[in-house]
Amino acid sequence: MNRNPLSPKTGMNRFVVFAFLLAFVICFAMAAPVQAQFTLVKISTDSFHNSYSQHKTEVEPDTYSWGSTMVAAFQVARVADGGGADLGFATSTDSGTTWTYGYLPGLTVNYKGGSNSAASDASVVYDAKYGVWLISSLPISNSGVNVAVSRSKDGLHWDNPIMVDSSGGDDKNWITCDNNAKSKFYGNCYQEWDTPEIMISTSTDGGLTWGAAKTSADGAFGSGAEPLVQPNGQVVVTFLGNNMQAFTSTNGGKTWGSSFTIANVNTFQGSSSLRSVGLPFPSTGIDKSGKLYVVWSDCSFRQNCATNDLVISTSTNGTKWTAPARIPIDALNSTVDHFIPGLGVDRATSGTTAHLTATYYFYPQANCDDSTCRVHVGFTTSTDGGKTWTAGKDLGAGAMQISWLPASQNGPMLADYLSSSYVNGKAFGVFMVAKAPSGGLFNEAAYTTKQPLEASADEPRFSSRGEKRIPGVHADRPFPNTQGEERESPSAPPGKQLQK
């Protein structure tokens, strides 16, 4: 009789039990984001008192970094019918350690001589050739919604806006610049918006003047477009049309090619009225080598489209893209609903060692409604070009109630997009945090973290390799369909089909 407790049979049984328990622990650990130890820093506040805003609110941030400077821009004092009393900025000139905030002058009637009632959709970039920061905006007035750009030499002092387009029917603007010194088009800046036809104007003088708006060769319709510039000067514009789509220019924006599909898109919208939960706008980034990354929310990996994951697709040439891969923030059987991602890519890294960070909003329980849904802010990071990711972490912004958020035409609002940026190798996200209203005012503002968003060297990384999109999965209902500044999804005019 063999009494050895480590006999082959007994040892194998123990190994099986250990493996089972280990798998259980990993799945349990990934079931919901872990509370991270971060100190939140409020970087701006709503100081306006105009009668038509919902005060003590800030929504919808974008960020960009260059050198030791990082600039965030966002709406301040949200107006229910669209935009904010003005656009605000928050700037750090010491790699995210301290922040200075203010408002863009001359943009609205609420600050330093503007003529517009509101402004929306901030997008920020730096033009390295001309040494100027640019914030793109949508000025809103009785005559419609236009596109403008504000300039600054230091990210702290801003000039009055320069009008880019005054057609009056614009939405979802985005701006980028060619900061590749060896590119033939170094210094070109590209301003995008939709009508909902995707339009792009080019500046060759640091945003002082802008050329006539142009479209893709096939007149693509969509929204949420984000242009990026590769080292050779090729501009790649990703956008949400009927699916995730893109088109390119290889001649500095003189002409644009026809649009093509990156991937089909399906999203879970659920039962809450929170704006943009089921809206898969792309969030994009580019590494040092010119590799492109696009992230969006998608339910295609979940049976019956039960909840949204974040998914990622990449391209080295702008025209051929990888099949979407699920970012393994948590396990496939989790109940977490992930939405509104903000991707940051460290432009000093590349390829298999590229550093990526994604911030996002999430519901711990996807099957919730306005009375039970609680919004959290999370993040995940990768140091191998998106091959593996850390488990999702809750940044500790609290469990935000839907009733704490300002109204928009399409529901209570945090954002249509988020943003993260790397400054000197350290990732920071800017996001909106809402607390319980007080004294008849909201309590929502722009925040970041004191510590950079990073993981320890020994923190587990997870891969979704081998996971497949489930055939036949479809969105629980069509994307939200609205018009004007508040249009959350692409909409073609009568008789015109969205381009595929």
Name every feature range the model reports, one short phrase each.
Residues 6, 21-22, 498:
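Leucine-biased recognition of intrinsically disordered, low-complexity hydrophobic segments
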